Amino acid sequence: MSSKAEKDIKWGIAPIGWRNDDIPSIGKDNNLQQLLSDIVVAGFQGTEVGGFFPGPEKLNYELKLRNLEIAGQWFSSYIIRDGIEKASEAFEKHCQYLKAINAPVAVVSEQTYTIQRSDTANIFKDKPYFTDKEWDEVCKGLNHYGEIAAKYGLKVAYHHHMGTGIQTKEETDRLMANTDPKLVGLLYDTGHIAVSDGDYMALLNAHIDRVVHVHFKDVRRSKEEECRAKGLTFQGSFLNGMFTVPGDGDLDFKPVYDKLIANNYKGWIVVEAEQDPSKANPLEMAQIAHRYIKQHLIEN
C-alpha cells in the first residue's frame, strides 16, 4: 500500500535514452511521437524536454493525447562566460517556455569550461575548477535565476554534473552554502555523484532539504573502471556503457528512495541514462527501469 509520500512522487523517464542532445546522430530516427508513446507503454507519467522537442502548442497537444506531463528541462548556464545580465536574459526565455508547457522546475548547470562534450578530455581527471571570484559570480547569478523562476511559478534545480565546475559533493556543498535555499534547489543525480565521488548517499544525506528534483541513473561499475583505465571522455564513457537504467547496473536505489520518502519528498524522480539506443533499446530499458521501481522500491 502506497504511503502519502509515495503518492506525492511522479515518475518520469528522460528522452536521452531515445535521442542524445550532445550527439545528435544518436537515435535521430526516434521521433517525438515514438518517444512519448514508448513512455506511456513503459508506464511512466512524464518526461523532460529534449533538444528536438517542438514549441509549446505542438508539444502540449502530443502530451495531452497521451496524458503525459513535462518534469523539467535542462538549461545550459553561462554566468561566468557571459555575465549575469546576459545569462539571465536567456534563462528568462527558458522559463517562459517551461511555464507554457506546465513544467515545475528549470534544471540548471553552469556550463562555462565544461568538458562534457570534449572529444579529448579525460572525464575522470580533467574537470574544470572555478576561482573564488567565479564562485561568487555563479552563486549570485543562480540566486537571480531563482528570482526569475519564481515569477513563472518555477523552481531552480541545480544539476551537479560530471565534467563541470560543480561536480563533487564538496563543490555542491559550497554551492548550497552560498545560495539562498528559497531560490536555489538541488537536482540530485545518483549516477553523476556515484561516478564522481563513489559514495552517492553522502550528498543526499547532506542536502535532502534542498532537493527539488531527482535523476535515477544507474552505473555499471565494471564499465566505469574500464572507462577510467582508458581515460575516456564523457561521451566515450556513456557510449561504452558506463550508465544504464535502475535495475541494470550496480547502484542500490532502495536507500535513496527510502531517504526521499522519509523526508516527504514531493516532486519528480526521472529515470535517466545516457546510452546508445542502437545498443540499448529505449523501450526495453524503460520497461526494465519501471519493473525495478515497482518491484524493489514502491512495493518493497
Curated annotation (Swiss-Prot):
The keyword Manganese applies. It catalyses: scyllo-inosose = 3D-3,5/4-trihydroxycyclohexane-1,2-dione + H2O. Signal peptide: none annotated. Pathway: Polyol metabolism; myo-inositol degradation into acetyl-CoA; acetyl-CoA from myo-inositol: step 2/7. Its cofactor is glutathione; Co(2+); Mn(2+). Pfam families: AP_endonuc_2 (PF01261). InterPro entries: IolE, IolE/MocC, IolE/XylAMocC-like, Xyl_isomerase-like_sf, Xyl_isomerase-like_TIM-brl. GO terms for biological process: inositol catabolic process. One of its GO terms (molecular function) is manganese ion binding. Its EC number is 4.2.1.44. It is an enzyme of class 4 (lyase). Keywords: Cobalt, Lyase, Manganese. Belongs to the IolE/MocC family. This is Inosose dehydratase. It comes from Lactiplantibacillus plantarum (strain ATCC BAA-793 / NCIMB 8826 / WCFS1). The gene is iolE.
